[in-house]
Amino acid sequence: MQFIDRAEIEVEGGKGGDGIVAFRREKYVPAGGPAGGNGGKGGSVIFVATQNLQTLLDFQYSRYFKADDGKRGGPNNCTGANGSDRIIKVPCGTVVYDLDSEEIIGDLVTPEQTLIVAAGGKGGLGNRHFLSNNNRAPEYALPGLEGEKRHLRLELKLLAEVGIIGLPNAGKSTLISAVSSARPKIADYPFTTLIPNLGVVRKPTGDGTVFADIPGLIEGAHLGIGLGHEFLRHIERTRLLIHLVSLTSEDPIADYQIIQGELAAYGRGLEKRSQILVFNKIDAVDEETIDNYQKQFAKITNAEILTISAVTGAGLTTLLAKVWQQLEQLERVEDETPSLFS
């Protein structure tokens, strides 16, 4: 499946139905009063978040969505039928922007969350509405109003608690396949992963936590070089990052600093996101090499360093225990943080 995480579309609410001019025409009532009904309301275009979609691919083929118009009013003061709403499913994590104002209209995070993106127009008033002491037989009515029209940009930001970051070939896809049921494409060359891979990892309690392997992070990613500019924003929703460093790289320290620099350059607080620093591929180097790199890293960071082999499974139990501990601490801090609205 092709992964599409950005789309531009047009949406339009339905037009309100017209009010009508009509008079009572009953037997024995030769001069009946006004009886023109109001028009029905136009339908609205409504987004509904769903967990059954993981991409905005559908919007590559359909870019215009319109709700039904309201029906015109009827005689005998009958109001026209309302137009049907146009319901559009979008993935959880979709952010909706108005392209004309560049304002965020909404952020659809939870399943079944709804957002009206184009309201339907009001129905026009029939001549019955204009009856007054001064005008006992109004011969005019109002047309329905046009529905709201909008040009939208949709951006999908993956909903994952834990993001796995690192340079290409650091072993991110191998790690996510080792700890979850995800089966991403894996090969021994850079840029194997061209889309974010999601995997659900089970806690000891049985609850699932979503991990995301974030691809495309290279030097200059925040400027749009490589794939990074498209994927850095997926990190924004994560609560915890696993920073994977391959010990078979020519310069693991430079690799680490490149990623840290890209997070800082992108901004939005990514450089302050909680991280677990992990040496990967310890099965491919000797103990002396591991020890030397631990000493070198200790000079540039105070972070605790975990060591794993995503291939053999060495150290994965310790890593996951650390992840659960960190997430629990983050939840405790968030619970203790006073709300601005309390």
From Swiss-Prot:
Residues the entry annotates as binding GTP: 166-173, 191-195, 213-216, 280-283, 309-311
One GO cellular component, as annotated: cytoplasm
Protein name, per record: GTPase Obg
Ranges for domain OBG-type G: 160-328
UniProt source species: Microcystis aeruginosa (strain NIES-843 / IAM M-2473)
Name of the gene this protein is made from: obg
Annotated CDD domains: Obg (cd01898)
Lineage: Bacteria, Bacillati, Cyanobacteriota, Cyanophyceae, Oscillatoriophycideae
Enzyme class: hydrolase
Residue span(s) of domain Obg: 1-159
Major subcellular location class: cytoplasm
Record EC number: 3.6.5.-
SUPFAM superfamilies given in the database record: Obg GTP-binding protein N-terminal domain, P-loop containing nucleoside triphosphate hydrolases
GO terms, molecular function: GTP binding; GTPase activity; magnesium ion binding
Recorded superkingdom: Bacteria
Keywords noted in UniProt: Cytoplasm, GTP-binding, Hydrolase, Magnesium, Metal-binding, Nucleotide-binding
